Amino acid sequence: MAADASWVREHIRAIEDYHEPGVTYRDITPLLGNEAAFGRAIDDLGTCFHAAQVSRVVGVESRGFILDAPVAYRLRAGFVPVRKAGKLPWAVAREEYELE
């Protein structure tokens, strides 16, 4: 069963019209700066996926790295970073696609 995550909204700041009118940026730095809230978020995410017995957690770009790496650790799983082409050093896997 999924954890109730409604509490996390109290720790995410909304910045209206960020860079352009109509865009709302969700700032997670208040969540990251609060040890208890950050720990609870990681624990709740880990609880949601514990029964799935995952072997890898995939984190997309920067926010995914911040949240998903600790979740992977909690689940005792590996972590796979996903970034735009040319942003990761060393050997990488690549998938090309077209938008619909």
Question: Each PLM stretch: what is its role?
Answer:
Residues M1-E100:
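PRPP-associated nucleotide enzymes
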